[in-house]
Amino acid sequence: MTQTLSQLENRGAFIERHIGPDAAQQQEMLNAVGAESLNALTGQIVPKDIQLATPPQVGEAATEYAALAELKAIAGRNKRFTSYIGMGYTAVQLPPVILRNMLENPGWYTAYTPYQPEVSQGRLEALLNFQQVTLDLTGLDMASASLLDEATAAAEAMAMAKRVSKLKNANRFFVAADVHPQTLDVVRTRAKTFGFDVIVDDADKVLDHQDVFGVLLQQVGTTGEIHDYGTLISELKARKVIVSVAADFMALVLLTAPGKQGADIVFGSAQRFGVPMGYGGPHAAFFAAKDEFKRSMPGRIIGVSKDAAGNTALRMAMQTREQHIRREKANSNICTSQVLLANIASLYAVYHGPVGLKRIANRIHRLTDILAAGLQQKGLKLRHAHYFDTLCVEVADKAAVLARAEAAEINLRSDIHNAVGITLDETTTRENVAQLFNVLLGDSHGLNIETLDKDVALDSRSIQQGMLRDDAILTHPVFNRYHSETEMMRYMHSLERKDLALNQAMIPLGSCTMKLNAAAEMIPITWPEFAELHPFCPPEQAEGYHQMISQLSDWLVKLTGYDAVCMQPNSGAQGEYAGLLAIRHYHGSRNEGHRDICLIPASAHGTNPASAHMAGMQVVVVACDKNGNIDLDDLRAKAEQHAANLSCIMVTYPSTHGVYEETIREVCEVVHQFGGQVYLDGANMNAQVGITSPGFIGADVSHLNLHKTFCIPHGGGGPGMGPIGVKAHLAPFVPGHSVVQIEGMLTRQGAVSAAPFGSASILPISWMYIRMMGAEGLKQASQVAILNANYIASRLKDAYPVLYTGRDGRVAHECILDIRPLKEETGISELDIAKRLIDYGFHAPTMSFPVAGTLMVEPTESEGKAELDRFIDAMLAIRAEIDQVKAGVWPLEDNPLVNAPHIQSELVAEWAHPYSREVAVFPAGVADKYWPTVKRLDDVYGDRNLFCSCVPISDYQ
């Protein structure tokens, strides 16, 4: 039969690119699991009462090329003015070698959070370098491997200050009046739920206030003034007040380290180390503290440890502080951070080194001095005598100045009374300074850049003598070695090849949805139309962003069954927090602010109780029955018991046990009956899209992990995006913003992120995914994700019991393999299997979550049958190896599993094991072998001997 033109156009071509198994392979797998079709399989698994009759109408699929052209036209509506707004965001020059070899490299951006250190040594080293940069610049003892943004870091500093404070009865937190307004906004939001009083005043008045447990100062104020807080910090320390200082990475290259002045905590944004503004993000925040407070720090910390052979190896240290272990008692609810962006900043520092960074910082400061000198020479007054890169210039006719700036396509900071703010950066040139003279003075000013340069070079007093850094920075060899592009390229490649990412193998992590991050989806994030916009530019300059965000929001509304979407939360955990705050504010608006009980199933992800605690709620755990489902009797009993104070339930769907619970609507009804709201965690949305939806099920609010279901890559541990969908009654209570009015969101609530749309520059990834898949493609993706999981479960169930199943013995989009019977019988643990999988070329599934002693497998729809079979074959081969241990062929203390993973050097070392070298390192054959660079890590050693800065180069050799 002759094909039609529509068939030849093949507008749904991307669907076949995204979904791994082709039609024939899907049929083979359907036959294997005993289902006639994808629709039949879905019909068997998903409860009938929550199945959608038709997929949400988000349009037909578009080809990669058509979608890129459409988005390019939208991006073209953004106006790329030169922004001198500052406020924590500046233009940057991302070195092309880092752009090409990291930001555009799937070997870096498709990796997962380094919970499995043996396959993560490359990015762990890059993160350790980031920590070293932080330690050197802040002058403190301990640093984390990034937080979500500067404002969030400020809120974390406040929470940490309270945790470590010896002033247990103090309940007030002081914020200096010249911190960035978005920082204050987020701090106030967090303080409200913690019950802290926030005092905002001039820093020199802090000693007038009583019952203060912590203080937040900003070394370079929001309008540019450099503060020497040494004496004030000493006085505060004498009163046992915890002092936090917000700082700027580039300024710290020249300025005295706050840690040297006695600060307890120092934080800020690493954005200006090579990361584009991107209309607000993503950007990595840095965070450092004194050694005595290390166990109270938020976020990931990379530490140096030893492997089983005694070699130096890196790992995430002190994980017992974190949400996946401590749950509601965790220091923070942080799960995803900003690893990819921290690594860009880290490698920016490596590439430029201390000499290059000082040259950049001094150039910025010199140009600022030249601008200041010229303006003062012509009679304009500066608000501050001491500055690094930002001037606050008093102007008589502000409207005229701003009009000239607009005509020259320049953005100045305009929210300062009778003045404008001007922040220079590494992209600023002498020509830019000359243009600024024209804007501020008119064209006939007669100033000469060369003459001004000579004057300020001889006599610059804009940085106080006592605030000039007098110690060396970045003395470690890693920052003084890789300064040619050839050396830098090879260094980055040497790190990349130590790691296992999606460009090499399936990453079957349950609850993580490690699916394809298509090249066409990634291309727009580096377009200058998206990358170069300041988040606080006038809204008419960001019409392309607003159109893209509006379309994406509309699609997500339809896919979730909600009425509105808020794009501000820049991680899943932050989305949880924002959603719970919306619930709290809703109850408060009804004079029911006392409702603070959050019901959480025993199987929940650790972020759920941690977020509930952060939102000021009390957690009450609901039991699960023997089949892993929410125990309805226990739910009813606890909902009724706490009826007067019931705020909400947090439930994941499909459940964290990997099944579609039949009673999910009844769960919603019970909670609503007793006055509560239903928070449906969107972690498993990849098994809902096009099949059902949270709103249709009966939920009131959800966060969506765009870095799972909607294809934003995990980046080795971030970035992520966690927008929330809400029903209409909660829409007035989603986060707002103090700097930018968010169009379409009638909200007066405080912010949870520094930027109004969170990490806006990665939203084009999800826009592209939905546009290229269309309604039918999205549904098919969910169905194939379910098929792939059931295929794995069906083929492995005889070797490894599948712990939980739904109707007809089916699972949802992931399955839990129960290793406990094997461990009891043979002594081989889930950890041994996880590490042995590395020898077979696989990242381990999720270990011991949500049930200890298990492995949770989520293949996603992007993996083809060949890769699924390779994983299944590896698991079956490992089961055969376990049987060898059981039979006594290999002793329990010396076999390929307990010694896994095996590294290359073992091939030429003395061999005393009862199994061969070939069995050790080539269990799946020699083709395309992945080589880990370290053996199994010693976690106990790493935490007992905590060391979180760069080690000698010789330790890597």
Swiss-Prot record:
Co-factor(s): pyridoxal 5'-phosphate
GO BP annotation list: glycine decarboxylation via glycine cleavage system
Enzyme Commission number: 1.4.4.2
HAMAP family in the record: GcvP (MF_00711)
Function according to Swiss-Prot or TrEMBL: The glycine cleavage system catalyzes the degradation of glycine. The P protein binds the alpha-amino group of glycine through its pyridoxal phosphate cofactor; CO(2) is released and the remaining methylamine moiety is then transferred to the lipoamide cofactor of the H protein.
PANTHER family xrefs: GLYCINE DEHYDROGENASE (DECARBOXYLATING), GLYCINE DEHYDROGENASE, DECARBOXYLATING
Name of protein: Glycine dehydrogenase (decarboxylating)
Source organism (scientific name): Salmonella typhi
